[in-house]
Amino acid sequence: MKMRAVAVFTGMLTGVLSVAGLLSAGAYAAGGEGNMSASATETNARVFSLHLGATRVVYNPASSGETLTVINDQDYPMLVQSEVLSEDQKSPAPFVVTPPLFRLDGQQSSRLRIVRTGGEFPPDRESLQWICVKGIPPKEGDRWAEGKDGEKKADKVSLNVQLSVSSCIKLFVRPPAVKGRPDDVAGKVEWQRAGNRLKGVNPTPFYINLSTLTVGGKEVKEREYIAPFSSREYPLPAGHRVRFSGR
């Protein structure tokens, strides 16, 4: 699973206070009689991340869709935004996720439905897309983020640090002609020397994801997956034996 995080900083003093104005607010709080005391200043940090019910989704092009469970492990609500991206994670893939945006309360779960909307995929091998799910924090004034009583605390100087996390898992489009499982064919990967590089050749219709790749007792960190019927090179210290394990 891949994760991207974006930090959002907000501050509030009986409504709105910018981060840049925090120092002046602190000085105000420590000021003369009738002002807020320093003890009324608080810092809150919240992570808006979601737990996904699977590490990958296998999609049969002939099916009517697949589902993915999304869990909010936090004690506060957040918006859930989902999309499917192409293999390079830069452009939209021909899939739709429903609902695309919704509120998920704390300690609750829901299901996403992924449906293909078009696109051409090779009939003899897997294709890789990415399902990305992001937890979105509220903006100042968002009513969906209010408490059960509909009120917000307005008597404290506060600095809110909100971390929005996007989690992406693999979506494998596996046509009916591709039989078996990747675990059954991982041992068929052929390893070759290519100068000071190690070349892995994948003769199978599956994406081979290397969970570990060890050379001379040292783990190779650059161990990206090997696409079907293709190859990938990895750095290789000379004169070492290779061990690997795949998904």
UniProtKB/Swiss-Prot annotation:
Q: Name one Pfam family in it.
A: PapD_C
The answer to whether keyword Chaperone applies is yes
- SUPFAM superfamilies documented for this protein: PapD-like, Periplasmic chaperone C-domain
Q: Which residues form the signal peptide?
A: 1-29
Swiss-Prot/TrEMBL keywords: Chaperone, Immunoglobulin domain, Periplasm, Plasmid, Signal
Give GO terms for biological process: cell wall organization; chaperone-mediated protein folding
Cellular component terms per the entry's GO annotation: outer membrane-bounded periplasmic space
Keyword Chaperone part of the UniProt annotation = yes
Q: Quote the subcellular location field of this record.
A: Periplasm
Protein purpose: Involved in the biogenesis of the AFA-III afimbrial adhesin.
PANTHER family assigned to the protein according to its UniProt record, in alphabetical order: CHAPERONE PROTEIN CAF1M (PTHR30251:SF9), PILUS ASSEMBLY CHAPERONE (PTHR30251)
Instruction: Return the similarity comment.
Output: Belongs to the periplasmic pilus chaperone family.
Q: Supply the name of the protein.
A: Chaperone protein AfaB
Q: Which organism is it from?
A: Escherichia coli
Q: Which gene encodes it?
A: afaB
